[in-house]
A protein has these predicted regions:
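N-terminal short leaders/motifs
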Residues: 36-51, 93-100, 157, 177-194, ...
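Short, His- and charge-rich active-site/binding loops that engage polyanionic ligands
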Residues: 83-147
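N-terminal module-boundary/linker segments of secreted carbohydrate-active enzymes
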Residues: 33-98
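Domain-level detector of nuclease and nuclease-like folds
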Residues: 128-276
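C-terminal motif of bacterial Sec signal peptides marking the signal peptidase cleavage site
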Residues: 28-29
């Protein structure tokens, strides 16, 4: 992970506001990033049976459909990365940060229409496919002041099983409660509105960015400084990204072009795809 631990500066212009973000580490442990691991304590009550797909280091061969062109982004870092396939999304998980590096979805109008009929049940659980020394557990979030923030939103899930899977802590990051229920929820809803208008599948990749070393819980779950959501529409060839601070006063800003987003992250989240 040392090779990702490089100093870079992100300059964003949002409504005439320029934000300089120095020494930020992203996607990995990475899009997420920066190693963070401590001893973990398992809770039998917290760990529930997870989806049957096994975790295979960065190998999404069992669920390529969630990635544009069937190709997952390659994250050039050390170990403790595990690919997790769920019914309606895929997670690249970092055992260093104990959070997703990114979460990929393939959405369309049919999926979202079905999702509107699914009742939500907030039953969070530690993902049993991850080693106890690499995952978050329910106690890490308890009393932390942070919400368990979905990367693949529960409101995107078209079946009861997919809904239940979305509450895996492998799909969560520590998120400011006001940001989670306010400006970030609006980004999620705006994305769904776009998908409902789109002509076919839309690929969405969501993840955290870490600019400091803040953690919660005895397992040291990293707290992201920012969140991003990348949207790609194959029918139009267009892609854009939302970028938002993990703060109570976060704002919904104009989306970034994919070119600018990719340059800042120095990471290609759409490998092999020609974006207009």
């Amino acid at each position: 992970m040392a090779n990702l631990n490089k100093r870079f500066q992100v300059i964003q212009t949002f409504s005439q506001t320029v934000v300089a973000l120095a020494a930020a580490v992203l996607l990995l442990g990475c899009g997420p990033l920066e190693p963070h691991a401590r001893g973990a304590r398992d809770s039998a009550a917290a760990a529930r049976p997870a989806p049957s797909t096994a975790a295979l280091n960065q190998d999404f061969g069992r669920c390529p459909q969630f990635f544009a062109g069937g190709r997952a982004p390659a994250v050039a870092i050390g170990g403790r990365l595990r690919a997790l396939c769920f019914d309606n999304f895929a997670v690249l998980h970092s055992g260093e940060t104990r959070t997703p590096v990114y979460v990929a979805e393939r959405l369309n109008r049919e999926i979202l229409l079905k999702a509107k009929t699914v009742q939500r049940h907030d039953r969070f659980f530690a993902d049993a496919r991850l080693p106890s020394g690499e995952r978050a557990d329910l106690e890490d979030y308890r009393g932390s002041g942070f919400a368990r923030g979905h990367m693949a939103p529960a409101a995107d899930m078209p079946t009861d099983q997919a809904m239940a899977q979305s509450f895996s802590l492998a799909n969560m990051v520590p998120q400011n409660p006001r940001q989670n229920s306010g400006p970030w929820a609006r980004v999620e809803e705006d994305t769904r509105k776009y998908v409902m208008r789109a002509q076919g599948d839309v690929h969405v990749i969501t993840g955290p960015v870490f600019a400091d070393q803040r953690t919660i819980g005895r397992n040291g779950v990293r707290v992201p400084s920012h969140l991003f959501k990348l949207v790609y529409d194959p029918a139009t060839g267009r892609a854009w990204a939302h970028w938002q601070q993990n703060q109570p006063d976060a704002k919904v800003n104009k989306p970034l072009s994919y070119a600018a987003f990719q340059q800042w992250l120095n990471l290609d989240l759409l490998p092999g795809v020609k974006v207009r």
